[in-house]
Amino acid sequence: VGSEMCIRDRNVMEKDNYQWWRRRFCKMAEYFTAYRIDHILGFFRIWEIPVHSVHGLLGQFVPSLPMSKEEIQSFGLRFQPEFMTKPFINDYILNTMFGERSEEVRQTFVQHVHHDIYEMRPEFDTQRKVEAYFAGKTDEADLDLKEGLYSLISDVLFVVDRDNPEMYHPRIAVQNDFVYRQLTGQEQEAFNRLYNHYYYQRHNDFWYREAMKKLPVLTQSTSMLVCGEDLGMVPDCVPWVMDQLQILSLEIQRMPKNPEHEFGHVSEYPFRSVCTIGTHDMSTFRGWWEEDRSVTESFYYRELGHWGDLPEHAPGWLCEEVVRRHLYSPSMLCILTWQDWTAMDESLRNPDIEIERINVPANPKHYWRWRMHITLEELMKQDAFNEKIRNMIAESGR
């Protein structure tokens, strides 16, 4: 199930003790004994993007605890609304971002304020307005210009709170942008302290209480086993709640929970977890193997302990080794994609690695169209392959 409840009216759903959700789970329990909550973080908070934005950088967590001017300054950063909450644009930025088209940007999309400082023209001061201007234009140069203007608009240090214009949120990932580079070294240090506090400490107790309003009611409404997709930017309060409610975590070796580890240690996974090689939103093991040679090199030599030449493509024996390691993990459940199972057999697996991936979240135009490349009848005839899987599962005690 998804956590789409979090973009509905929370107060209305809370008034009847989440009856709509509880009914939904009771109906599911007639057919299933376990379910996964996709993006369980949505029960703690959701990332809300304003209607005037195309990209997500100008979003803010809902619910959240925005910061006042006084609190921002308590971190040692002098708050300057004009500089910090509006796109910072100067000649250097325009020349760097747009090159030979910088003059066109000056004449059409921005207006001069003072010295070498500019601001977006009112007719182009949101990403949606820029999007409308470029509607129907497919030339690559125009598309690059549009993306550049999007970036220009999101070049702010703080996002104004959606409900209170006197409160602010540090813009996510702003350390990569021009406005951050305008700060002095001391100001950057102050901003980083504020940023880390906001994104990794400030909301833990607050979001814990938010989740505990909803999740106990829902997870205890049936006897179904509950798994949670707890990947990505996970605040500390998430494992607190999942452990308290005995919700299984999702463990993926290439997305370790410990930030000090390059890869997760399969043998150290918690019992209350689901281990898998990859999800529908990720490349298969064979696809991942060919994405970044330096990463697979580290995995091959350091994590697996092999020596000799690094295989250019993931051979069947290597795929089998990775599958076996997952089967022998302490995780309560080991659930692998069909593509990662068939990767063990070089004569059976799909020769086209690219079409094995189910979903590409970063591509809004991608749609789910994956299909097995052989029929079930053909698969049932693969006696040696099927026997191997049967033995691997039995030997691992699963």
Predicted regions mapped to residue ranges:
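Catalytic cores of glycan-processing enzymes that make or break glycosidic bonds
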Residues: S3-E4, R8-R398
